[in-house]
Amino acid sequence: MAAKLDSQLLGLVFQSRPDILKGIQEAADSPARIDLFNNIASFVYERIADNTSEEPATKRRRVEAQTSGPNGAAHPIAGSQAAVLGADAAAAEPVLLEIKDISVSVPQRKKYDLCFTKNFLYARASGSPVPVQGIVYPWKDIEHAFYLPVPDKSQVQHNYVLLPRNSYLPTTKSQQSADQQTQQQTSAPLEPLVFTIPSTAPKPGTITGPSAAAAAPVSDSYATLFHWALTTSLHAAGNHACELVSSDPKVFHSVARQAYRPQEKAVHVKAFRGSKDGFLFFLPTGILWGFKKPLLFLPLDKIVAISYTSVLQRTFNIVVELEGGGEGSEEGGQEIEFSMLDQEDYAGIDQSYVRRHGLADRSMAEQRKAKKQLAENAKKAAANGEEGEGGEGGEAGDGLTELERAQKEEEQRLQDEEDEEEEDYDPGSEGESEGSGSSSEEEEEEEDGEGEGDEDDDEDMGEGLEGEE
């Protein structure tokens, strides 16, 4: 069997020096040289791993935090072995679809080629054969995906936001310490991925790979192309829980006119989180704050209540209370505050979004969680091919699906609770006036008793008179 260059290992070792990599490929013209280059790459790779583990902790943290990538671009690296293994696994799979020259803003701000494989989405520098470490996403780990307009731009642009597991909720100090201990045993959580597309169609030669022919009918615009590619890849990898959600003016839109596109309804509001400015998007599935790091997404089922503070003539603040750490957790819920919202949007946020979703009332939080659990159970049942009572699709004799029946049962339970509260209602607890009413009833009963006694006396007197006659 002819010797072959270990392109994967060489790519990892010489990722920042594509010129050396190219020279090796040109010089590898004999089996002896191929073995030599492979041995050199293996030796260098082992030395890098050994040096990383033997460095003092303070120096290692500094180096692992940031390093120089291709073309001098700084990015978080593979000091972590898990990141290297993730990149290796992605690089080992054949690229099904590649879309070139896409502007990525999170976790790094740079143009990359986005590659779609069976199990991964990753970015790689133009001309490089290996993924950029830290921008490798298993399809199964992506929990939320959004398609949102980019604010404050004269040209129409949109951001795709992909949120992997454990990447979008704020963490408390106790959670951070627990996460650090977990990360020592497992891989560190991925950062969100945000990339921007224009409203134009892709240029010729931008789309390559075996699936390029299948993508041709949906390549009239970047939006239709990525919608198809993301949805198809998620479903093919077995991730049916994640759906691509777009902003909807019917769900929420700002009344403030946009400076750059005044004829277009803005589906965002400007807001600060601490000293950082950003944009709040009120979406069908939750509230997203972007597009600066760290991004936040607050799902509806995690929100306990929303309240308002510092309501002034021109601005107000919004406070989102999140549920605690779950069952058995002693830690209370978090409160996330966004400040300096425009007063013009107060009514729209409160009426069109907060009250419509029952977010102003803490008592609705359990119902939202119950509905989510019911929906997840229904999806699991459908995925496992389970059938409900009465036949296919989880339908029983009432013609309802499992989810509809569960929601109906939940509504009935709430109604029963209200009925029980009405039955337990004690009129005597409302004040002295109710007590006096009870006294008057007793007096009436006494009077009735006296009246009956008088009638008896009259009868006795009548009998006595008859006897005398």
Swiss-Prot record:
Keywords assigned by UniProt, alphabetized: Chaperone, Chromosome, DNA-binding, Nucleus, Transcription, Transcription regulation
A Pfam family the protein falls into: Rttp106-like_middle
InterPro entries tied to this protein: PH-like_dom_sf, RTT106/SPT16-like_middle_dom, RTT106/SSRP1_HistChap/FACT
Signal peptide: none
Feature: compositional bias, Acidic residues: 416-433, 440-469
GO cellular component, one term: chromosome
Record-level Gene Ontology MF annotations: DNA binding; histone binding; nucleosome binding
Main localization, broad class: nucleus
Residue spans of biased composition, Basic and acidic residues class: 364-379, 402-415
Domain of life: Eukaryota
Stretch list, region Disordered: 54-73, 364-469
Binding partners and assembly: Interacts with histones H3 and H4.
Function, in words: Histones H3 and H4 chaperone involved in the nucleosome formation and heterochromatin silencing. Required for the deposition of H3K56ac-carrying H3-H4 complex onto newly-replicated DNA. Plays a role in the transcriptional regulation of the cell-cycle dependent histone genes by creating a repressive structure at the core histone gene promoter.
Protein family (similarity comment): Belongs to the RTT106 family.
Protein name (database record): Histone chaperone rtt-106
Organism expressing this protein natively: Neurospora crassa (strain ATCC 24698 / 74-OR23-1A / CBS 708.71 / DSM 1257 / FGSC 987)
Encoding gene per record: rtt-106
